Amino acid sequence: MAEVLLFHHACGLTAGVREFAATLGAAGHTVHTPDLYDGHVFDTLQDGVTYAEKAGFGTFVERGRAAALDLPAGLVYVGFSLGVLPAQGLAQTREGARGAVLVDACAPVAEFGGAWPQGVPVQVHGMEADEIFAGEGDLDAARALVGSAADAELFLYPGDRHNFADPSLPSYDRAAAGLLTERVLAFLDRLT
């Protein structure tokens, strides 16, 4: 089974993120969920983003890198929204990455290096009308990634919600989250 390093979104390590990790764990995968916010959890995306901005987004990425140091190299990196930054950065730069799943966000590949690494499959998931994912360049970055990487998939879901896969937030979309979970489990099974 796969070993996964899962990074939470800007609201923190919510009950919904923990639930997603538990679902992967129940399927036999080993899942690590570092708390990059030191216990802080926010009810709104804006409050979480404000916290991340005060700490600095680079701090968030560095905490993610530090969380990976004591773990084996052969990880699948999963990130939700802001958590995509450390997940994508590690998938692109840490030797031995087995795969990546990027949810609600995607940075340009050039942000972390010249090209997506050979042999590292990636999935990107987002809502087609999410003003952050679709309106701030993430969707364009995801399309460019899929167009340049050998094993990359982009899954667009109907709707306009950000953090749609977290059942502990009001933005939760049960149907889209269920489909995302099925696709991620199939992806992880393919890697084992």
Range-by-range predicted roles:
Residues 1-72, 164-165:
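Serine-hydrolase catalytic machinery in alpha/beta-hydrolase-like enzymes
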Residues 149-192:
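C-terminal catalytic histidine-bearing segment of alpha/beta-hydrolase fold enzymes
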Residues 79-83, 87:
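Gly/Ala-rich beta-loop-alpha elbow adjacent to hydrolase catalytic centers
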Residues 77-79, 103:
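Short beta-strand immediately N-terminal to the catalytic nucleophile in serine-hydrolase-like folds
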Residues 124-126, 157:
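Short beta-strand/loop motif that positions the catalytic acidic residue
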Residues 131-140:
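Conserved alpha/beta-hydrolase "acid-adjacent" motif
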Residues 116-122, 148-151:
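Short, proline-enriched alpha-helix->beta-strand connector loops that line the catalytic pocket
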Residues 96-106, 121:
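A conserved short beta-strand
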